[in-house]
Amino acid sequence: MKIIKNILLVISALSLSFGALAVDTSFPNDKVTMWGDFGGITLDVKLIGGAPYDPLYQSMIPIWEERTGGKVKILSKKSHFELDKEIKVDIAAGNISYCVLSNHTSFATQYGDIYRDLNGIIPGDYLAEFVPLVLEHSTVEGRLVQLPQHSDVSNLWYIKSIYEDADNKKRFKAEYGYDLAPPETLDQWKEQAIFWSDPPNFYGTQYVGKEEAITGRFYELVIAEGGALFDDGWHPTFNDEAGQSALQWFVDLYNAKAVPAGVLNYLWDETGLGFATGTVALNLDWGGWGAYFNSADSKISGDVGLIRFPMGSGGKRGGWSGSHTYSILNGCPEENLDAAASLIWILTNHEAQMHEARGGKLPTMTRVWDDIANEMDAEGNAFMSNLFSTFKASMAEDAFTPPLIPEWIPFSNIIYPELQAAILGDKTVKEALDAAAKETDILMQDAGYY
């Protein structure tokens, strides 16, 4: 209960920390602008919501409305998992009349032909500012169906002081036979998490435990262990030795009580908030939490370390990656297209990405990577400089997307309950993965892959 109470204590402070980011309303560094006179136009939109996302809307949408005369009507704002379900209901009901949708490169392919092609709607000079590979991942069957706002990859955060404590070093070496330092491998991560744990007051680590979140975490451990989800012919292979080793890692941590008992209900807010309470030693998470972890509202401010994702036995690091994006839908009236393009411009432009990067989110514009690094160096902000150098290396050397196919989420819906069943002990690791592989084989056959 203590960790839950601590999480609740910091929720109100969270929005303040994420929101304390300045915007230069003159947009001096934007080479391309897309202002217009949109008086009388109201754009219906559905957006991802939550503490890491709302401050951008709160900052940028009022500026857009004041400068253009247009209005934004937010029909829905919720987590991506809940928004995904809502979009599918909308598609089934033929209710896709809104203009702008929060999207994600991992989700976009499953929604079919609901999108406007942004080529020709968004100026080429503006598109040229984005990282080419990110635009490639935003393209489906030759059509640019989404404009990327920020990218994600995870690295391992840790509480520095517990690693610097002389007594901890002595006890750890006596028990495990090697010097205490932030983990370099998945095995060390597991050993250290067990060493640190003192439930229910303190836990060695944690993980997101449901929906596509745990699917993605399992996926990157499979890769780190030298495996793959599918072979070249799209037959499932995740129930092999590498997949079993990956799932056993989650099971062992749960059985050792090295993670909170409620992790199978955790998503991103729970892991981020939990780490900031100072009750978790090691936390695999996105860069976008970085500024909050080190803020005055966090109980670990000034005591936060960061390393790249540890190596698996396959000689690879985890690096499950994707980008948060915005799409314009076919249901958007022709007379509203320029306004819709202008809105997603202000949510993805240089100023918006600098705004987000100051909190730790990873830019999708090439120039912003350099500009944010220069800004942090000039300020002498060693913490944020290290954040961007670490995550830049991960994006360049470790990052990989999930399969960008329409079946990704249906596949996730098959496998994640089986992962949970193994973690809870209701099935063995092999039983769970074999069951998921059998159902996945049917899914892929029905989809026409073989």
Model-derived regions, located:
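C-terminal lobe and pocket-closing loops
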Residues: F27-D37, G287-S301, G312-P417, A447
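Helix-loop-helix "hinge/cap" segment bordering the ligand-binding cleft or interdomain interface
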Residues: E66, K73, S138-I214, A224-L264, ...
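Short, polar/charged alpha-helical segment
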Residues: S26-G36, A51-K71, I415, L433
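Immediate post-signal peptide segment of exported/extracytoplasmic ligand-binding proteins
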Residues: A22-D44, E65-E66, E141-R143, I194-N201, ...
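Extracytoplasmic/periplasmic substrate-binding proteins
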Residues: V100, A108-T109, G216-E225, E241, ...
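Short, solvent-exposed loop/beta-turn-alpha elements that line the ligand-binding surface or hinge
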Residues: T33-D37, N119-F130, E136, K170-P182, ...
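Extracytoplasmic "Venus flytrap"/periplasmic binding protein-like
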Residues: M60-L133, H137-L147, A166, R171, ...
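Hinge/lid segment of periplasmic solute-binding proteins
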Residues: V23-D37, L101-W157, E164, D187-K190, ...
